[in-house]
Amino acid sequence: MNGKRYELSILPLFEDDLNEIVDYITYRLKNPAAAERLVDDVEAAIIERLTCAESFEPYHSARERQYPYYRIQVRNFTVFYVVIGNTMEVRRILYSRRNWKDHI
């Protein structure tokens, strides 16, 4: 590692995505403990990535992007983020088997 630690920015769209996932697991699947564990795992994965946000292969989006997307796999979900200067901006969390082309 290079010792650099990025600032963290979380977009409201990511929060909306995560809230939908948590609601689905909690109310539809009736498993609030699993929803809580997922949130803990997502948070831990994001914090861990703050020290090496650009050390992974960028995700090649079908759209032209000013900043390349990077991914973090957390269970059956993928967290998408970009790096802008010294900031890791977390933008989306999507179900890994979902067609991302319409969303990323």
Residue ranges and their predicted role:
Residues 1-65:
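Basic, Lys/Arg-enriched alpha-helical interface segments
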Residues 29, 74-78, 82-104:
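Enriched for short, Lys/Arg-rich terminal
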Residues 24, 45, 67, 87-88, ...:
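General helical secondary-structure elements
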Residues 52-85:
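Basic/aromatic recognition patch in beta-strand/loop cores that engages polyanionic ligands
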